[in-house]
């Protein structure tokens, strides 16, 4: 009889956003006359920029001609895209990244789950608490997390690093030594950012302890404060201890188009074994490459027109973030985020739990957000709102919330 991967049976309920979706569908069925506004899941609402659409059309036409047709892409991705990434995302910030250290993928979510394939099962992970659920759930699937404690809401073999109002939602170095450290800045869900000085301490710590940092920089384009690094490789020594995940979803609207990349420096080794070589082997074996059409669109993001157009979209979303943040503060809420990230993290009022506030907002304002407890134990009593809606819906949602 064949056997299943029993680690999947340890996963707690359904994926957070699936649960939210079910609740919202039920509410809509029971209240067909209500106009529900979602400030929940972080999906963009603006269309792809004109220069990106133009590149998509051109590449599509190329696929119709024998002379310009493209099949499988190179394992690492097309050089024209990797060169643009190296130049604009790294060289422009004083960081040198070799083209064979850049691995094109179909998104940061895939890579954040897949990167665990190159690490042994008995590695101990450390995560921020609250945290993007994919980091923990994919390690549950891999058998690294131990057993779930229903009382504490924690896994026995996971080091939780609390992110609280007291530490401005940036974790302290853990007392227990981890092997793999997951960091995400600007942070999802709290919207917090990390200064270069604080991130350097994490790099120094990882080198000292022989740990590796998985650094999710999917929201770096939203950074507005100069003392916050856009890449972990701005820190001295980071190439010896860090893998960086990047995405085109939030900076260029590719949530439905799917494109991202991962940086694995050749300096990063374990017992003399190159993680770059391991990831290249894994990448070439399990992934046939992002489509040529999509990679061409990705390269257009770095054109002068693409840079200007995507910056305009980012400014649009960050204006929404300002509307949410200012409106909530005016209504007496305790909030953070919304300055270097498109997420606003609010303390639930009147002692409500995260899910109680979710139901309260849905039932009384027809507004959807994300319960903080879905991101980890330290998220209880908090709630996430996103700035990815339309400006008009954002204004209306805040009007409803302020009138409660």
UniProtKB/Swiss-Prot annotation:
Modified residues (N6-(pyridoxal phosphate)lysine): 250
Binding site for substrate: 15, 42, 109, 132, 188, 288, 384
Transmembrane segments: none
Family: Belongs to the class-I pyridoxal-phosphate-dependent aminotransferase family. LL-diaminopimelate aminotransferase subfamily.
Purpose: Involved in the synthesis of meso-diaminopimelate (m-DAP or DL-DAP), required for both lysine and peptidoglycan biosynthesis. Catalyzes the direct conversion of tetrahydrodipicolinate to LL-diaminopimelate.
PANTHER family: AMINOTRANSFERASE (PTHR43144)
PROSITE patterns assigned to the protein according to its UniProt record, in alphabetical order: AA_TRANSFER_CLASS_1 (PS00105)
Subunit architecture: Homodimer.
Pathway: Amino-acid biosynthesis; L-lysine biosynthesis via DAP pathway; LL-2,6-diaminopimelate from (S)-tetrahydrodipicolinate (aminotransferase route): step 1/1
Coiled coil: none
Record GO biological process: lysine biosynthetic process via diaminopimelate, diaminopimelate-aminotransferase pathway
Gene Ontology molecular-function annotations: L,L-diaminopimelate aminotransferase activity; pyridoxal phosphate binding
Sequence positions that bind pyridoxal 5'-phosphate: 72, 108-109, 132, 188, 219, 247-249, 258, 288
InterPro entries tied to this protein: Aminotransferase_I/II_large, DapL/ALD1, NHTrfase_class1_PyrdxlP-BS, PyrdxlP-dep_Trfase, PyrdxlP-dep_Trfase_major, PyrdxlP-dep_Trfase_small
Keyword terms of this UniProt record: Aminotransferase, Pyridoxal phosphate, Transferase
Reaction(s) catalysed (UniProt annotation): (2S,6S)-2,6-diaminopimelate + 2-oxoglutarate = (S)-2,3,4,5-tetrahydrodipicolinate + L-glutamate + H2O + H(+)
Pfam families (alphabetical): Aminotran_1_2
Domain of life: Bacteria
Protein name (Swiss-Prot/TrEMBL): LL-diaminopimelate aminotransferase
Root EC class: transferase
E.C. number(s) listed in UniProt: 2.6.1.83
Signal peptide feature range: none
Cofactor: pyridoxal 5'-phosphate
Gene: dapL
Originating species: Lachnoclostridium phytofermentans (strain ATCC 700394 / DSM 18823 / ISDg)
């Amino acid at each position: 009889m064949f056997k299943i991967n029993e680690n999947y049976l340890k996963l707690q309920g359904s994926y957070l956003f699936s649960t939210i979706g079910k609740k919202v569908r039920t509410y809509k069925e029971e209240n067909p006359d209500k106009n529900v506004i979602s400030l929940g899941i972080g999906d963009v609402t603006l269309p792809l920029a004109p220069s990106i659409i133009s590149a998509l059309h051109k590449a599509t036409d190329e696929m119709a001609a024998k002379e310009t047709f493209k099949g499988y892409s190179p394992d690492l991705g097309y050089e024209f895209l990797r060169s643009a990434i190296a130049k604009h995302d790294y060289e422009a910030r004083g960081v040198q990244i070799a083209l064979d250290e850049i691995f094109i993928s179909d998104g940061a979510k895939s890579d954040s789950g897949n990167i665990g394939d190159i690490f042994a099962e008995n590695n101990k992970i450390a995560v921020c608490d609250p945290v993007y659920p994919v980091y923990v759930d994919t390690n549950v699937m891999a058998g690294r997390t131990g057993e779930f404690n229903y009382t504490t809401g924690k896994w026995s073999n996971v080091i939780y690093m609390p992110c609280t109002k007291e530490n401005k939602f940036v974790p302290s170095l853990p007392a227990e030594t981890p092997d793999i450290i997951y960091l995400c800045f600007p942070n999802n869900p709290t919207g917090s950012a990390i200064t270069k000085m604080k991130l350097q301490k994490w790099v120094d710590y990882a080198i000292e302890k022989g740990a590796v940092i998985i650094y999710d920089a999917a929201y770096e384009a939203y950074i507005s404060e100069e003392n916050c690094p856009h890449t972990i490789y701005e820190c001295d020594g980071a190439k010896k201890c860090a893998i960086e995940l990047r995405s085109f979803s939030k900076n260029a609207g590719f949530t439905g188009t799917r494109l991202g990349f991962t940086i694995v420096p050749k300096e990063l080794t374990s017992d003399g074994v190159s993680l770059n070589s391991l990831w290249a082997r894994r990448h070439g074996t399990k992934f046939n490459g992002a489509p040529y059409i999509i990679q061409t669109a990705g390269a257009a993001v770095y054109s002068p027109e693409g840079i200007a157009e995507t910056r305009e979209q980012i400014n649009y979303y960050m204006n929404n973030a300002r509307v949410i943040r200012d409106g909530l503060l005016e209504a007496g809420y305790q909030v953070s985020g919304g300055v270097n990230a498109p997420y606003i993290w609010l303390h639930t009022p009147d002692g409500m739990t995260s899910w109680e506030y979710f139901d309260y907002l849905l039932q009384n304002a027809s507004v959807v957000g994300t319960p903080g407890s879905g991101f980890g134990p330290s998220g209880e009593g908090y709630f996430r709102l996103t700035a990815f809606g339309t400006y008009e819906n954002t204004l209306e949602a805040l009007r409803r919330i302020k009138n409660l």
